[in-house]
A protein has these predicted regions:
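Hydrophobic alpha-helical transmembrane segments
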Residues: 2-116, 132-138, 145-146, 152-288
């Protein structure tokens, strides 16, 4: 990562070095997604999805086509991550008798960490982009800028407080399985945005929007619906609906502001999808 202070002048040779380094970084990033058809078995594709999505050190890289071929399992992968959150919450509550607020904070910290903070970064950039006055090109440039503005920081604070609050409410209801359903539904929100959006001309996000088969989306929703119903019944399905609404909403906002869905848009959809899913679960618990 290269950081340039606004207060320091950069001479020509430094600019050339920076340009060369950025080209190397871009090349390395593209190499990750090179269309290498060798060894793209189902298990390797699945391992590639895990490597792409988390900080779990599998170290297995494959083509973007291979990752997309198993994208219907993305919510299931998130469900396993959510299961880890359920286990953590249960241990902290039963063995250490921690307060619900502290447990909720630890659980969301675990989720952010294991996901590598990737989607959080998208939420920050997305917030900065939509708050800028100007055309879609200007908004996209701001969204892709390495600096974080007031809108991004403010959104992050509000989002984190709301997430911790709703998780605390969930624990108050003794509904720990809601952690699993909410995390799984986050990816359904992301996939919903993929289906409803137009791809950008470049960036990682364009592959998911451009090459996302509708059959994969339907399969992902059906699997998620079954899992949600098994663990929480109609409450779980209500949470899944909340995530789908979130995905559609983020797609609409992205179209209005950027015209396309970038990786930052998809990351935002993941985070807002989790939050809205959890809120819908909390609303549904007294109803069902």
């Amino acid at each position: 990562v290269i950081l340039i202070s606004n207060n320091n002048k950069v001479n020509t040779s430094d600019k050339e070095d920076i340009h060369d380094n950025l080209e190397d970084l871009s090349k390395n990033r593209d190499d990750y997604y090179e269309d290498d058809k060798k060894n793209t078995s189902f298990l390797r594709s699945l391992a590639g999805l895990v490597t792409f999505s988390t900080i779990i050190p599998l170290g297995i890289y494959t083509s973007i086509e291979a990752v997309i071929s198993v994208i219907w399992l993305w919510p299931l992968l998130n469900a396993l991550i959510g299961l880890g959150g359920v286990v953590i919450a249960y241990i902290l509550l039963k063995l250490f008798n921690m307060s619900h607020l502290l447990v909720a904070t630890i659980v969301i910290s675990y989720i952010f960490l294991i996901m590598g903070y990737n989607h959080i970064d998208g939420l920050l950039d997305f917030s900065d982009g939509i708050m800028v006055h100007g055309d879609s090109k200007k908004k996209i440039n701001v969204m892709r800028d390495s600096m974080v503005g007031t809108a991004g920081i403010s959104t992050m604070v509000i989002f984190t407080v709301m997430t911790v609050a709703v998780l605390t409410n969930l624990i108050d209801y003794n509904c720990l399985w809601g952690i699993l359903v909410g995390e799984m539904s986050a990816k359904v929100s992301l996939l919903t945005t993929c289906i409803l959006s137009k791809p950008a001309e470049d960036g990682i996000g364009k592959y998911f929007v451009e090459d996302m088969p509708i059959t994969n989306y339907i399969t992902a929703v059906l699997i998620s619906g079954i899992i949600a119903y098994i663990f929480l019944g109609y409450v779980g399905l209500f949470g899944l609906i909340g995530a789908i609404i979130a995905g559609a909403l983020i797609s609409y906002i992205a179209k209005r502001n950027f015209g396309v869905a970038t990786g930052d848009v998809l990351g935002t959809s993941n985070e807002i999808g989790r939050l809205l899913s959890l809120i819908f679960i909390v609303i549904a618990i007294p109803l069902f």
